């Protein structure tokens, strides 16, 4: 069993952690891993390890959409959040993660990133991975290929501008999740040719449906107990998710689950050290 360690929430540590990950990038399974830094709160859930994802080996992951997923051990989870940033709720999700010294991945909508660049910088400054989720959240399987890719690129450019002050369609973190998990083969092939990992999910909380935080907690924990591990999808723009998150993290801690933080391989992971 991997020793569970937490994370110290400083940009200096984030930079050191990125250097450690990059230095470990060559492995036989296409990922690199390192233990996380020590957490000031000894009883926190923490982050057990960092997994560096190579797009050549893992171009598409998440069993809900693809035949392959990340190489996670039993009771290992990757926490991912879509559709932010939305300051009223994203800030509460970030606070819950910080309380437990947990790092996650946020797939941002470019329009929201443009509207809330300070929140984007906060996500990165607190050590989380920033991925991409289009600019306007369209149904990409129902629009022309050129229009879909333009929306992908516009979203990446908006996220990069919010993070680094530079508009570019070359993502500093080449992680993308299609809105509604809807894509065409041509879109998937193009992103693969650009070295961008496409993320699905292994399970989700269905937090787009109307339910109480308590109902959501019951639903996602039952699904996790059935699957035993996996990439979990939440939405940080949902008030019910923000309200449920402290209890969910406590459930993970009390039931022996371990959080894995995903980062890109072969990059400087600039978005983990944005001030």
Language-model features and meaning:
Residues 2-80, 86-99, 215, 249-251, ...:
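N-terminal pre-catalytic segment of deacetylase/amide-hydrolase enzymes
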Residues 72-76, 101, 125, 135, ...:
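Extracytoplasmic
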Residues 77-80, 104-108, 129-132, 174-178, ...:
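Structural recognition of the beta-strand scaffold that forms the well-ordered cores
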Residues 89, 138-165, 182-228, 243-244:
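Alpha-helical scaffold elements lining the catalytic groove of polysaccharide deacetylases
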Residues 93-99, 113-131, 191-193, 223-225:
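Acidic (Asp/Glu)-rich catalytic clusters
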Residues 166-172:
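Short helix-terminating capping/connector loops at secondary-structure junctions
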Residues 225-263:
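Catalytic grooves of carbohydrate-active enzymes
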